[in-house]
Structures are given as structure tokens and as C-alpha cells.
Amino acid sequence: MASSTHAEVIEAHLGSAADLDAGFTAFNTALLTDGAFIRVPKNVVVAAAVRLLFITTSADGDVATMTHPRVLVVAGENSQLRLVESYAGTGSTGYLTNTVVEVISEANAVVDHYKVVRESSTANHIGSMHLRLGRAANFSSHTITLDGGIVRNDVHALLDGEGVTCTLNGLYIANGKRLVDNHTTIHHAQPHCQSYELYKGILDDEAHAVFNGKIIVAIDAQLSLIHI
């Protein structure tokens, strides 16, 4: 298991990017028993996409359940990774998926991330992604929400080195009485960083959507470029 073979790396990074003051992140951490750990060593390029699939199954009459998936990604210096995380559910019984993803990108690492939400229409999905991006790292995320009763996607990005490029894109489709809620925070903590954001959606019937985007520029983060 990763917890035994990579214990030092996990202990050094797990929780280091996440905001443990956030209620659902703290909830996930308190109930953490299992998850996925991805480490890309220095100068390694992973040619094929790494795919993570989380499925919740239920039958009529089942008791509602909660799951708390946790993902930790450590991308070493000059490494490259493409990651696809997908969430799906079956059955008519409601459930809660409360997931936390942490990505630590070291200098010049390139990470291309995709999240696809296809939860059951009776499910609630709360997903939090926390990023700490080192010097000249390039990170892009594409969040695609296709199903789920109530879906909230939170992204917190710390641009923690000079010359970082961070791109956050989102697409959502909702009908009926569903709610899709996207919240992003990008913190330009160092100079010469760039950030890009684009979220688009299609709504039908009585569906609702929320987008709340925050960009923080530190006083010393000179020559920051922000594209929204």
C-alpha cells in the first residue's frame, strides 16, 4: 500500500495544501481511511492519462450513504501528468460524495486535470481541490458537471512560485431542479504569474447555477496577469 511504501512523502504533503478550516475538507480529513496517491518523480513524463473512477451504488430502500474519497498528487520537478477523475452513481437512494483532491506541483511541472461529475440525480456531490504550484509550474483544470442533484465544485489555487500558469475551466449542464455551484479562489502569491478562468453552462427547466470566483493578488506579486 502507498501508505507504507511512500509514508514519508504522504506525511510530508497530505494536508499541506488543503484548507482544514473549511468544514467539508475537515470532515473528509477526519473520516479519511483510504484514497489515491499519485507521485510523479522528477523529470518523468507519464504518457498515458491516469484515470480515477469513484462509483457509488445503491438499491431502492437502501440507507443513504456518505463517501469521502481523498486524492493526493505530487508532481516532481520537470514532470508531466494528465489526470482524469470521474464520479458516478446508480440507484434512486440519495447519498453524499465529499471528495478532497490535493495537488502539489514542483518547479516546471505540468499537470493537466479533468474532473467529470455524473452522480445520480438524487445525490449530493461536494468536491474540493487544493493546489500548491511551484516555480514555473503549469496547471490546467477542466471541471465538467453532467449530473447530480446538488453539485458543488470548489477550487483553491495557490500560485506559490514565480512564473506559474494556472488555468481553470468549467462546463455544466443541468435540468429539472438541480443545482450546480462552482467556487474558485486563485491566490497570486508570487510575481510573474498568469491565471485564466472560463466557466460556461446550459440550464433548463428550474435548474440553477452559481459561480463565485475570487482572485487575490499579494502586494509583492508584481506583473501578475489575470484573464477572466
What are these regions (language model features)?
Residues 2-226:
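Conserved beta-strand/loop scaffold segments within soluble protein domains that form the structured core
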